């Protein structure tokens, strides 16, 4: 059985297992870009044919370690970092719902998220029904459609 670590230990140790001669703690990578020897190598990264770091806004070792720590703390299988809650909302919904799909959401969500769902994602073909957080089970059930993908 795998050893269960306390949250404090996971915060410090999860996501990084140093090899001989490597630092105990992963350094913070402050670079925006990463070096490759040829433009072909970069092209393969941009085309998602190869994996690796090439632009920090997309991925870097520091972000990967933070995601691994969050994953360990939450007991998950993977985690993804975003630059904002709005981006997290977009990714969460758009990975579940496609053009022609439907989602049920609370009517009392953050205004920017309401706008993202009611306007922007509607333009992308995802329809939303907003229900009161105090709605009954019957009212919630009535909001569902055959193409509802998420609540």
Model-derived regions: residue spans:
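Hydrophobic alpha-helical segments in the ANL/AMP-binding
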Residues: 91-94, 112-120
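Glycine- and other small-residue-rich loops at beta-strand/loop junctions that grip anionic moieties
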Residues: 55-56, 81-82, 106-107, 129-133
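PLP-dependent aminotransferase-class I/II
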Residues: 115-151
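Short helix-loop-beta connector
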Residues: 73-77, 97-100, 145-146
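Conserved PLP-anchoring active-site segment centered on the Schiff-base-forming lysine
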Residues: 95-113, 132
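Short conserved active-site loop signatures built around small residues
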Residues: 1-29
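Conserved N-terminal alpha-helix of the aminotransferase class I/II PLP-enzyme fold
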Residues: 38-87, 115-119
């Amino acid at each position: 059985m795998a050893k269960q670590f306390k949250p404090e230990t996971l915060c410090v140790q999860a996501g990084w297992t140093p090899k001989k001669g490597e630092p105990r703690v992963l350094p913070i990578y402050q670079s925006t870009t990463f070096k490759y020897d040829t433009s072909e190598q970069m092209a393969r990264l941009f085309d998602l044919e190869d994996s690796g770091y090439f632009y920090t806004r997309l991925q870097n070792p520091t972000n990967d370690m933070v995601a691994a720590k969050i994953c360990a703390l939450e007991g998950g299988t993977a985690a993804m970092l975003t630059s904002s809650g709005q981006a997290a909302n977009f990714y969460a919904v758009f990975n579940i719902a496609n053009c022609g799909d439907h989602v049920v959401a609370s009517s009392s969500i953050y205004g920017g998220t309401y706008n993202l769902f009611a306007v922007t994602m509607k333009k992308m073909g995802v329809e939303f029904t907003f229900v009161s957080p105090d709605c009954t089970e019957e009212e919630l059930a009535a909001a569902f459609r055959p193409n509802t993908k998420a609540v």
